[in-house]
A protein has these predicted regions:
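Alpha-helical cap/lid subdomain in secreted, periplasmic
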Residues: 74-220
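Short hydrophobic segments within beta-strands
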Residues: 6-7, 141
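Conserved SGNH/GDSL esterase-like catalytic core that processes O-acyl groups on lipids
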Residues: 2, 16-120, 196
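Residue-level detector of flexible, active-site-proximal loop/helix-junction positions
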Residues: 10, 61-64, 145, 186
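Short active-site segment of divalent metal-dependent hydrolases/proteases
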Residues: 10-11, 201
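Active-site metal-binding loops of divalent metal-dependent hydrolases
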Residues: 8-9, 98
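Short glycine/proline- and aromatic-enriched beta-strand/turn motifs that initiate or cap beta-hairpins
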Residues: 3, 9-10
Length: 220
């Protein structure tokens, strides 16, 4: 089973993302976060738990779903990186939305092609993934809270996150994809700066995604 990841900085790791992508978890930051190897990242923990292998990690630090740039998750350029030259993924994990929330991206577009609104671009992203990878199972994760003790410049308001999560839930349902519910007022992940998970934080994210995927598989 081959996995591809559509993510932002939380899902990056030096040496595992496409050439010229911005990466948050450089060797120095990985050490700061307590990540001993790529196997301590949330996404590799998920892949390993299902006995799978990585196809592509299409994660770009600082990227939004919305926006008219090649780094935007809904762009043709980003979506095209979900497959490799040799293979296609069986599963695509979409873990996007934190930067849109933090950046205050407009929630609802004026029309279906609005590249600057979260709801329209999340839908465009899923349309393009499904068109390119019609056989892949697509899982979309809502934005998870950080631990109550987390602090730093990236701390988000709970009520604000939920506005974006509501869009993720609805658009995921409308496009026939599987939802992984990550939002729980009583569960958060630990960080190094208020947003980016440390080793324990990566484990917490992985646990939520693994549980969500298993629930979805049982209901299929």
């Amino acid at each position: 089973m081959k996995f591809s990841i559509m993510g932002d900085s939380i899902s990056t790791y030096e040496g595992y993302n496409p050439f010229l992508y911005d990466v948050f978890y450089t060797e120095e930051r990985a050490i700061q976060a307590g990540l001993r190897s790529v196997n301590d990242t949330w996404w590799m923990k998920v892949i390993n738990s299902f006995g799978g292998e990585l196809c592509m990690n299409d994660s770009y630090s600082g990227s939004y779903v919305a926006g008219a740039t090649s780094a935007s998750a809904h762009s043709v350029e980003r979506v095209s990186k979900l497959k490799s030259e040799e293979s296609l993924p069986d599963i695509v994990l979409v873990c996007m939305g934190a930067n849109d929330c933090g950046g205050g991206i407009t929630l609802h577009g004026e029309d279906a092609d609005d590249e600057y609104a979260f709801d329209t671009t999340y839908g465009i992203m899923l349309d393009r993934i499904k068109a390119m990878l019609p056989e892949a199972k697509i899982y979309c994760a809502t934005v998870m809270l950080t631990d109550d003790e987390a602090s730093g410049k990236y701390k988000f308001r709970l009520d604000y996150i939920e506005k974006y999560n509501e869009i993720i839930r609805q658009v995921t349902k409308d496009h026939g994809c599987a939802l992984i519910e990550m939002f729980d007022k009583h569960i958060g992940y630990t960080t190094i700066d208020g947003l980016h998970p440390d080793r324990a934080g990566h484990q917490a994210i992985a646990d939520m995604i693994i549980a969500g995927m298993k629930r979805s598989m049982l209901s299929d």
